[in-house]
Design a protein with these regions (language model features):
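Conserved CoA-thioester-binding segment of acyl-CoA-metabolizing enzymes
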Residues: 1-57, 71
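C-terminal alpha-helix plus adjacent terminal tail
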Residues: 1-12, 79, 187-188, 208, ...
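Terminal peptide-recognition signature
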Residues: 17, 21, 35-36, 54, ...
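A short, glycine- and basic residue-enriched loop/turn
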Residues: 22-25, 59, 148-150, 185
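Charged catalytic carboxylate motif
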Residues: 31-35, 106, 113, 209, ...
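Glycine- (often His-adjacent) and acidic-residue-rich active-site loop
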Residues: 56-113, 275
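Short, active-site-adjacent cap segments at secondary-structure transitions
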Residues: 59-63, 130, 232-235
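Crotonase-fold acyl-CoA enzyme core
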Residues: 112-225
Length: 302
């Protein structure tokens, strides 16, 4: 298959998937999730391959969804990352949460092909892995970062929820909350200290370290790798990973269509996505004046 958003190559027992939209910092478009899943399937069906390395072309690993295209454009289902047609006679301003869920859950499961792959997956994170890009990286079995690279989910501040929900399963409740209640980015050193990623090394040593671990894994028989991975993943399945992802995907759609989400969408249309992001992440109150009371009714008996 000819891929438009990534490159796929095999060298000995190692398959490499390279996200290949460097001019957009490998931002996710509508094609990329399915192409990731297709490349993972190619590797799983290739008897020569024992391990898969995922990386990005250019300066970034993945900057998340290509929201400049979606956030700055006015149109149907405002705020939706998916857009989509509107039936004749329907209100074009209406948001269909189940249509949104259908598309975003499909993307999430395509990212999760990295987690469910029968062959181990290693994310080589040399540059920013943010928003949806962090979702992709954290779906891999192992994540090795450059110390200088950053990872995080800034849309947790407004307009998003991490649909793969891997933060809590990697960090535990308190550290996951610390990251998602702030939307902060952390560098590779801090990510490794927190236990979010396996390790961080200087950028100049990243290729050698990834190759070292990949080659060590690749020496193991494929059936042994498959058994160990299925056993570990089963523990996470038993903890409710799939249900948490469904919940997170629903919340992601809601976040994009909340009063604050619509504020962000309007700001992106007015001043451009980059400026809207600067306002979101600048440290001041987010979406001033947009929020509604969380408790709109008085207390009983009050």
């Amino acid at each position: 298959m000819n891929h438009r958003t990534l490159r796929y190559a095999v060298d000995g027992r190692v398959a490499t998937i390279t996200l290949d939209r460097p001019d957009r910092l490998n931002a996710i478009n509508l094609e990329m999730p399915g192409e990731i899943a297709d490349a993972v399937d190619l590797a799983n069906r290739d008897d020569a391959v024992h391990v898969i390395v995922l990386t990005g072309a250019g300066e970034g690993f993945c900057s998340g969804y290509d929201l400049k295209e979606f956030a700055e454009a006015a149109g149907e289902q405002p705020g939706s990352q998916l857009g989509g047609g509107v039936d004749a006679g329907a209100d074009p301003r209406a948001w269909d949460p189940m249509a949104d869920f259908f598309g975003m859950h499909e993307f999430t499961q395509q990212f999760m092909s990295l987690w469910r792959s029968y062959k181990p997956t290693i994310a080589r994170v040399h540059g920013p892995a943010v928003a949806g890009g962090s979702d992709i990286a954290l779906c891999c079995d192992l994540v090795i970062m450059a110390e200088e690279a950053v990872i995080g989910y800034p849309p947790a501040r407004v307009w998003g929820c991490p649909t793969t929900a891997m933060w809590v399963y990697r960090l535990g409740a308190e550290r996951a909350k610390r990251m998602l209640l702030t939307g902060d980015l952390v560098d590779g050193r801090e990510a490794a200290r927190l236990g979010l990623v396996l390790e961080a090394v200087p950028r100049a040593q990243l290729d050698a370290r990834v190759a070292e671990i990949a080659e060590r894994i690749a020496a193991v028989p494929k059936n042994q790798l498959m058994m160990q991975k299925l056993m570990v993943n089963q523990a996470y399945d038993a903890m409710g990973l799939a249900g948490t992802q469904r919940f997170a995907t629903l919340f992601d759609g809601i976040a994009r269509h909340s009063p604050e989400g619509q504020w962000f969408k309007r700001r992106a249309e007015e001043v451009g996505f980059k400026q809207a992001v600067r306002e979101r992440d600048g440290g001041g109150p987010v979406a001033p004046g947009a929020s509604r009371p969380l408790a709109p009714w008085p207390r009983r008996g009050g």
